[in-house]
Amino acid sequence: MGTTARAALVLTYLAVASAASEGGFTATGQRQLRPEHFQEVGYAAPPSPPLSRSLPMDHPDSSQHGPPFEGQSQVQPPPSQEATPLQQEKLLPAQLPAEKEVGPPLPQEAVPLQKELPSLQHPNEQKEGTPAPFGDQSHPEPESWNAAQHCQQDRSQGGWGHRLDGFPPGRPSPDNLNQICLPNRQHVVYGPWNLPQSSYSHLTRQGETLNFLEIGYSRCCHCRSHTNRLECAKLVWEEAMSRFCEAEFSVKTRPHWCCTRQGEARFSCFQEEAPQPHYQLRACPSHQPDISSGLELPFPPGVPTLDNIKNICHLRRFRSVPRNLPATDPLQRELLALIQLEREFQRCCRQGNNHTCTWKAWEDTLDKYCDREYAVKTHHHLCCRHPPSPTRDECFARRAPYPNYDRDILTIDIGRVTPNLMGHLCGNQRVLTKHKHIPGLIHNMTARCCDLPFPEQACCAEEEKLTFINDLCGPRRNIWRDPALCCYLSPGDEQVNCFNINYLRNVALVSGDTENAKGQGEQGSTGGTNISSTSEPKEE
């Protein structure tokens, strides 16, 4: 019996131990087991690839498992999400009340899985998404840099150097002639507006040379014969570089090193120094917005100032807003505000460009707009959240897309006639300019060239421009004022270059309903472009 009793005691002990290992113990037993269980979160779960990566950072085996890139998360300043469950679970035994601990027992693997699954998803998403920005950033950088590397230089792009972009120019050859004569090839016209006016006279001489060269190229590219075109371009290039060296020797500074040579050696030197011998330049990013179209409203309107009051009054008849919008259109309130403001502007402009009147009209109109905004239960304009105050006015002023009221004005350069330029001139546009002789030139270009096939329009317009300049400096010399003294220069490329820089560089092109503009200008035979000689837009 004694042996049987001892055996029964051993079996009872084993049964109790087995029941305790299966979670059937008391709350006290749970408090003893939970810390050990949470200590193993991350590797005590059944083996699976995702869970094998979720080792705590401070685990002794964490450095021996998982892919090599997983280790990068350990050196990041923010604590990893994988370590967070461990820190929270270590505090649970001390922080949880007793009644929480004696609740219904949970399976031992339920809590680790719930804690681990979120921590597995986020690191994987972060680590899969992290390389993407690096991959994206590695490609756009060269493109964004190249887009502006040949564009107009200024101090914001690293200061002025010893030469302008594209100088010296490449020598014309059969390899680059087509690129030289490409209609859409862009180049910078240099002058006081984009060159330093002190201590950099060598850049001014380079800019004048490039301007002179482009004028000659424009003339040569009109030759129908490829051979004649190439010979013409070569002569223009050689003359331009010879003129440059003459200008270099006319000052007391050290001349360009190629100018110290003579004849063919000088030309070969310039050719070897050319940074872009094939003239394959990227198009420079334009800061001039295209003429807007569609139902885009210029809202909020810019605050009237002494600087934009002329545009507000003198260009008011060219500003147009869409009509007949549906009554439910969300732009209706903005459209109504613009119409009311234009009506008030008309009253103020009749008082002699009254700035105080326009500013008060602007403020009152936007206050009424905000009143209508709050009359409906929709999203209200951000600025209307402010009460009527200078803060609200400043908010609207900052968000005005066209603070100068120049949405429908595009400044064009008639110095270089291209197919794209003719596309603007032959459309339903109005040209405004200070110079009284420009309307006649634009009229001739559009009336005689817009009916031709598109590829021939630019060539025709360039010939009309040269003819018109010769006429202005010839029989009609005394009927207009020439403040730049262009007609005193030698006829040809030098004279044309002077016109391009001083008279044709900035011409305002206005888009809109020009039929309502009364008593202004004339209309060409194509019915496309209206001409107006006025001092309203700013050209300089």
Swiss-Prot record:
Look up the domain of life of the source: Eukaryota
Protein keywords: Angiogenesis, Biomineralization, Disease variant, Extracellular matrix, Glycoprotein, Mineral balance, Osteogenesis, Repeat, Secreted, Signal
Q: In which tissues is it expressed?
A: Expressed in breast cancer tissues. Little or no expression observed in normal breast tissues. Expressed in skin; wide expression is observed throughout the dermis with minimal expression in the epidermis.
Gene Ontology process terms (BP): angiogenesis; biomineral tissue development; chondrocyte development; endochondral bone growth; inflammatory response; negative regulation of bone mineralization; negative regulation of cytokine-mediated signaling pathway; negative regulation of peptidase activity
Q: Which compartments does it reside in?
A: Secreted, Extracellular space, Extracellular matrix
**2 X approximate repeats: annotated span:** 150-405
Segments of skewed composition (Low complexity): 528-540
The principal localisation class reads secreted
Q: Where is the composition biased (Polar residues)?
A: 71-85, 146-156
Leader sequence segment: 1-19
Keyword Protein transport attached? no
Q: Which GO terms describe its molecular function?
A: interleukin-2 receptor binding; protease binding
> One Pfam family of this protein, by short name?
ECM1
Asked if the record carries the keyword Thylakoid, the reply is no
**Could you tell me which residues the sequence repeats occupy?**
150-279, 283-405
**Sugar-modified residues:** 354, 444, 530
Q: Which parts of this chain are annotated as the region Disordered?
A: 41-85, 120-175, 515-540
Q: Which cysteines are joined by disulfide bonds?
A: none
Q: What disease does the Swiss-Prot or TrEMBL record associate with this chain?
A: Lipoid proteinosis: Rare autosomal recessive disorder characterized by generalized thickening of skin, mucosae and certain viscera. Classical features include beaded eyelid papules and laryngeal infiltration leading to hoarseness. Histologically, there is widespread deposition of hyaline material and disruption/reduplication of basement membrane.
Task performed by this protein? Involved in endochondral bone formation as negative regulator of bone mineralization. Stimulates the proliferation of endothelial cells and promotes angiogenesis. Inhibits MMP9 proteolytic activity.
Quaternary state and partners of this protein?
Interacts (via C-terminus) with HSPG2 (via C-terminus). Interacts with EFEMP1/FBLN3 and LAMB3. Interacts with MMP9.
**What protein name is recorded for this chain?**
Extracellular matrix protein 1
